[in-house]
């Protein structure tokens, strides 16, 4: 696409209409401050952009800040590396959702780290199904063990 205006408009429409939550954040000290969120992010979290812009994105973690995935994200951001992980987040109404979060550092034309681009996908259904499968497999293993002990 040769027309830069057309390309910019297409990219804007792509981000605004994406099904996944997309955010842009900038690093300020130990904080990662949201400077843009798309409509899908607002739908996913229940927060409007007016409520959350220029805040650190940790508000989605609620009180549950001891998750291993949070350490993974923080380390990647501190090292300016891309990362993808799943973490537990909370919507504005307090309900839990499992968030597959991808964070990618963005460098400007002089190779300065300027922003982080985050993409959020609600994977609650997948996590719930995996937990149910793991539980069923544990029960099967326990039953197999009990059957083996009865055979002796």
Language model segments and positions:
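Terminal output helix/cap of sensory domains in signal transduction proteins
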Residues: 63-95, 143, 149
